A protein has these predicted regions:
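Non-catalytic terminal/accessory segments
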Residues: 1-273
């Protein structure tokens, strides 16, 4: 937390991000940051005097007609939050051995909805059911005490944890500029919030994995589906007859592509992803 290079890296990472020229809760913008500002922040870190200002609240329209709360932090807080994110990423998402589950794709380096879809396509053959869920107001509902206790599983530096406490408890300004306490949640719009949410949601992944192991049985499906073989034989007969342009041939090919090679209703096999 005291190395100048880390703060310079944080500044370079966020200075050109969309929306970062929007004035923060202190009225300043990223182009007002200087080396003197960074030196002041580092000194305040050493003496534990750095304080996060309340975030400025704005409301962003959602596709369903509702509005999402977005907190705009002060310019100095943006840099410190990015430093926190960089450090947490090194702890929880190191290339040498990430803490998060391999199946977790949200708010992680080199991962996205596209990588999640590629994994489903490549590793989840013959899936019968998908369970869709949504964590309502995920960022807003995170319990501060529970989150910090989870962080303590990996982090022993109480100064760093105290800085995260300050971030969580910074409060917010409403549209009338009145200050309110932050009793729960991580500020949406904050650079550190996504990875803090991942630390919390990781416990859900752990529980899901526990359930998967408990209910899954049978390493591989043992019963092969006889229908694809019959259809393949029918296809070969049509090829030998030269009837590859017929409706019957197209139907057979389509059925071969759509029918799984193994028996999906095998009672001795339950596969869960």
């Amino acid at each position: 937390m005291y190395k100048e290079d880390v703060y310079m890296l944080a500044y370079e990472r966020i200075k050109s991000a969309p929306g970062n020229m929007t004035p923060g809760s202190d009225g300043t913008t990223m182009d007002g940051i200087s080396m003197s500002t960074i030196h002041t922040i580092i000194q305040e870190m050493r003496t534990e005097q750095f304080q996060f200002k309340p975030v400025r609240t704005v409301y962003i329209p959602k596709a369903n007609g509702k509005k999402r709360t977005l907190g705009i932090p002060s310019t100095r807080a943006k840099i410190v939050q990015e430093v926190i994110r960089l450090l947490l990423e090194g702890i929880y998402d190191s290339p040498n051995g990430p803490y998060f589950h391999e199946t977790s794709h949200g708010f992680r380096p080199d991962r996205s909805c596209h990588t999640a879809l590629r994994e489903i396509r490549g590793k989840w053959p013959a899936v019968n059911w998908f369970l869709e869920g949504d964590i309502q107001a995920c960022f807003d509902a995170i319990d501060h005490g529970v989150l910090v206790s989870l962080l303590r599983k990996k982090i022993r530096d109480e100064r760093f944890l105290n800085l995260i406490w300050k971030l969580l408890r910074a409060g917010y300004l409403d549209l009338q500029e009145a200050r309110h306490d932050s009793l729960a949640g991580t500020p949406q719009g904050g650079w550190a919030s996504p990875i803090l949410a991942n630390v919390s949601v990781h416990e859900l992944d752990e529980k899901a994995e526990e359930i998967r192991v408990r209910w899954e049985r049978g390493g591989k499906r043992k019963h092969r589906n006889p229908l694809p073989r019959k259809l393949s034989a029918q296809k070969e007969r049509l090829v030998k007859k030269g009837e590859t342009r017929t409706k019957e041939f197209r139907t057979v090919v389509q059925r071969i592509r759509s029918i799984p090679a193994v028996e999906v209703n095998d009672p001795n096999f339950i596969g869960i992803n």
